[in-house]
């Protein structure tokens, strides 16, 4: 099995730990976390420690492939005043699977599915707005072109095997938690119709169908808030599901 190399700067924690392995095809999941100086480092082959959907599948012709993931990030993240939008990988889960909420699809009226990689970049397809088209499995995950299995939403299989709310770390080093409905997203679907592009009612098909409203005890625009006295990010059951920006 070919092995893809992934090397990027992220941030995650826990002192040396190996998770229980399962076999996916002829490959077992491998995940190690360890502290190296001021960094928390992760080594993973990208194979999850839980059952996945069958791939390839309709809407997703890619097969899960062993990866080479080597991630190190700061142990003591600092929250900045301004956030940074993130396209691509946002963080890593406690089983070595990556969080990558965005899609590579954009509105394209000439395409059979009305979206393509070469479409209008003002309208980015939201994967949960086109359910059934991009092959999400029961873990809210699917497979990228390079064979990378990754999460787009609540990682069901991981949560079922994890007794703690901590399910991962973001690229800036802050923790990622899932607390079901105890934390509420500050994002809402816009009302009315889109003024350009796909001229229809805002329905969640595109990321741009949502806007940040906030208020009260809602999470900030990066799906962040306070957990046990510390700033953390949260996976939520509603948009944005996984943070689309980071404050670190």
Question: Which residues make up each language-model segment?
Answer:
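Surface-exposed intrinsically disordered loops and tails
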Residues: 111-127, 186-213
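Short, recurring structural edge motifs at helix starts
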Residues: 134-141, 217-223
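Hydrophobic h-region of N-terminal signal peptides that target proteins for export
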Residues: 11-20
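Long, compositionally biased interface segments
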Residues: 198-248
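Solvent-exposed N-terminal domain segments of exported/luminal and surface proteins
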Residues: 21-133
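Short helix-loop boundary/capping segments
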Residues: 152-203
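Bacterial N-terminal signal peptides that target proteins for export
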Residues: 1-10
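Extracellular/lumenal glycan-associated surfaces
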Residues: 94-100, 145-158, 228-240
């Amino acid at each position: 099995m070919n092995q893809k190399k992934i090397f990027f700067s992220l941030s995650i924690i826990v002192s040396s730990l190996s998770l229980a392995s399962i076999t996916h095809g002829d490959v077992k999941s491998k995940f190690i976390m360890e502290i190296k100086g001021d960094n928390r480092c992760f080594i993973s082959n990208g194979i999850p420690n839980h059952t996945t959907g069958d791939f390839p599948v309709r809407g997703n012709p890619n097969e899960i492939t062993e990866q080479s993931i080597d991630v190190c990030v700061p142990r003591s993240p600092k929250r900045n005043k301004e956030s940074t939008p993130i396209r691509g990988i946002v963080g890593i889960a406690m089983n070595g699977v990556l969080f990558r909420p965005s899609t590579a699809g954009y509105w394209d009226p000439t395409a059979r599915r009305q979206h393509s990689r070469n479409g209008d970049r003002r309208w980015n397809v939201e994967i949960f707005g086109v359910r059934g088209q991009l092959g999400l499995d029961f873990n809210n995950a699917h497979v990228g072109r390079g064979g990378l299995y990754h999460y787009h939403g609540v990682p069901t299989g991981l949560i079922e095997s994890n007794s703690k709310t901590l399910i991962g770390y973001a690229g800036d080093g802050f923790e990622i938690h899932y607390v079901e409905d105890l934390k509420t997203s500050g994002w809402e679907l816009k009302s009315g119709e889109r003024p350009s592009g796909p001229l229809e009612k805002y329905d969640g098909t595109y990321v741009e169908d949502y806007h940040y409203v906030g208020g009260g005890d809602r999470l900030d625009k990066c799906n962040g808030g306070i957990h046990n006295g510390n700033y953390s990010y949260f996976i939520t059951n509603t948009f944005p599901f996984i943070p689309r920006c980071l404050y670190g």
